[in-house]
Structures are given as C-alpha cells and as structure tokens.
Curated annotation (Swiss-Prot):
GO BP of this protein: 'de novo' pyrimidine nucleobase biosynthetic process; 'de novo' UMP biosynthetic process; amino acid metabolic process
Subunit structure: Heterododecamer (2C3:3R2) of six catalytic PyrB chains organized as two trimers (C3), and six regulatory PyrI chains organized as three dimers (R2).
Primary enzyme class: transferase
Catalyzed chemical reaction(s): carbamoyl phosphate + L-aspartate = N-carbamoyl-L-aspartate + phosphate + H(+)
GO terms under cellular component: cytosol
Keyword tags: Pyrimidine biosynthesis, Transferase
Pathway entry: Pyrimidine metabolism; UMP biosynthesis via de novo pathway; (S)-dihydroorotate from bicarbonate: step 2/3
Binding site for L-aspartate: K87, R182, R253
Name of the molecule in the record: Aspartate carbamoyltransferase catalytic subunit
Length: 338
C-alpha cells in the first residue's frame, strides 16, 4: 500500500486514483475480517477519535463511531446543546479544545461549507497533530459517503471482487436535488475519476445547467487536478428517457432544510415527474442497482415498493459498506501521523 499523502480529508476532488484504491483495498480487507468472524482488531488501540456533529445524523455518526470502535480506538462524542457553544464559544475554538485534550482525529459535520478547511488550517497553525475528517459540510462535500457509494457500485458490477475498472463508461443516473446535495458533489468527483458517464436528472431549479461544468471547477487548495481522465456529465429533464439507458441509479432526497426559497410547485408534482417507481424502472430491460444515501422520504423521491421489493436495491449494502470504508479512512489518517 502506498504512503497515505493526506493529513486531513475534506473532499474527493483532491483524491488520486491511488488514493481511491488504497481506501477500497483496505476496506475490502476489513470487510473480509468481519465476514470471517473478527469484528474488532487492535489497529488503533490507544488513539482517540472525537465525533463533532453539529447537524443531526443517524448513519454517518454511528457508522464512524462503530468504525473507530472496531479498530479499538477510544471514541469521544460531542453534544452541541450541552457544550460551551451555548455560552458563545466558536466552532473553531471547540475543535482546538478537543485537539488539546488529545484527539487524534476529529470527525466533523457542520452546516457551513468549507468549515473543515478552516478548522484544519487553525490546527496546523498551532502545530497540532490532530487530523480533520469531513463528515459532511454544508453543500460542499461528504467524502466518506461518496467513497462508500462507489465502493458499493464496484462490488456490485465486479460481483463482489474489487475491480474499479468496471465503472468505466457505465452510465450512472443521479436523480433529484443535486444543487443542495454534498453527497452528489462527492459522487461526481468519484464516479468521474473512474470514467463513469454521469446523467443528472431533475428540474432546472434543482439541477442548474452549469452542473455540466462542475468537474472543471478547481476545488479549494487544489493545485492541479489529480485525475487526468474523467467521465462526462450530462443533464436530462426526462426521468423516463434517462432510466432507459442507465446502468445504475443514485436517488437523492429533497434537501428541504437547505432550500432558501420554494423551488418546486409542489412535492406531489415533483414525485410524479421524478419519483422512482417500479413502473418507471420497468422501462429499463436490466435489473440495475439502486442506491440512496439516506434518509429516505418514502413515496416522494422513491417508492416504498422499490425500497422493499426491488431485488437490486442496495441501500442496506451502502450502510454496511460504510463501516469498512470509514475504518479505512480512520486507519489511514492515523498511520499518516505516526
């Protein structure tokens, strides 16, 4: 395995192919250990992972904490409502405080885009050894979700082996609220890195035309594009036509808590046009994989019948795969600091 080059993980925009492969190979090894009956290993014994979640979370928060515990790390959790934030302390000072307590990795979720960059810069300025791992920041990025989504697709298409080349030229359809989705942005970087052709489908209020240029926009602190050959992004307004040619589908929920104005005429009309149903899926002559990062709004962006009965609905696979992916990220960051 290559030497891990990152002290902090903010975004997949700065990931090279070797970075992806390092994460996937290590996650696969951790997954194999679990499947053999070994649920806990001493890889990070004596280290401290601190979970700083300023937004609600079920999957990501618990997945990171379980990942840390399976590596035998100590886990410190944070509750905003009972912290000094209520007394006026800043988020950055909170992070510095936990670093001073000995946190080796801060896993951070917050509503402000790019906040993890600010925190990491402050920590580095005081020569802290603490790593920062972005667990979702505003509209910007959700790298661990992007990684687990691509890992799930690779395992599906390569029949549970690990061949990232299987995504090359695959048509991956992403449906819904791309504009307000940090998951979608991470998926765009990761899918394109492996040569997938991406179709974004939804109304213009949720997928503006400029998303076709997304991959041409430099990421913060990105000196050069680490991946030279990418797939392409196209935009469709017809879900039915998009489903006909898709090799896989990623469904996004409506991020109503991030919408600053009413962008839809009604939820019912959105569901009618862009909700994924068994009837619409029947337009594709293959049983293609369906992903959703959760939480699900049943019978709005995806029908309960698809979630519960469609044979290649991989939502639970995503949740399961999130644990070894996050184990890999925590392990790589800590080994970088040793």
């Amino acid at each position: 395995m290559q030497i891990w080059p990152h002290k902090h993980i903010h975004s997949l925009a700065n990931f090279s192919i070797k970075d992806y492969e390092s994460v996937f190979e290590l996650a696969n090894r951790f997954d194999a250990l679990k499947n053999s009956g070994t649920k806990k290993i001493p890889a990070l014994q004596g280290t401290l992972v601190t979970s700083l979640f300023f937004e609600p979370s079920t999957r990501t928060k618990n997945s990171f904490e379980l990942a840390a515990k399976r590596l035998s790390a100590d886990v410190q959790t944070f509750a905003p409502s009972s912290s000094s934030l209520t007394k006026g302390e800043t988020i950055i000072d909170t992070a510095i405080t936990y670093s001073a307590m000995g946190a080796d990795t801060l896993v951070i979720r917050h509503s402000s885009s790019y906040i993890t960059f600010e925190i990491a810069e402050k920590l580095d300025a005081i020569n802290s050894k603490t790593s920062v791992l972005n667990a979702g920041d505003g509209l910007h990025s959700h790298p661990s979700q992007g990684l687990l989504d691509i890992y799930t697709l690779i395992k599906f298409f390569s029949k549970n082996t690990l061949n990232p080349g299987v995504l090359n030229s695959k048509k991956i359809l992403i449906i819904g609220d791309v504009n307000h989705s940090r998951v979608a942005r991470s998926n765009l970087w990761a899918l394109s890195a492996f040569g997938a052709d991406i179709i974004l489908c939804g109304p213009e209020t949720l997928i503006p035309d400029e998303f076709t240029n997304f991959l041409k926009t430099p990421a913060p602190n990105q000196i050069e594009d680490p991946v030279k050959s990418r797939g392409c992004i196209t935009i469709s307004r017809s879900l039915e036509e998009s489903i006909k040619i898709a090799d896989a589908i990623i469904v996004l929920r409506l991020q109503k808590e991030r919408m600053m104005e009413n962008l839809l005429s009604s939820i019912d009309s959105y569901s009618l046009d862009y909700g994924l149903t068994s009837e619409k899926l029947s337009l594709n002559n293959k049983e293609i994989p369906i992903l959703h990062p959760g939480p699900i709004n049943r019978d709005i962006e995806i029908s309960s019948k698809v979630v519960d009965q469609y044979p290649n609905c991989l939502i639970n696979n995503q949740v399961s795969n999130g644990i070894p992916i996050r184990m890999a990220l925590l392990y790589l960051l800590q080994k970088n600091n040793q």
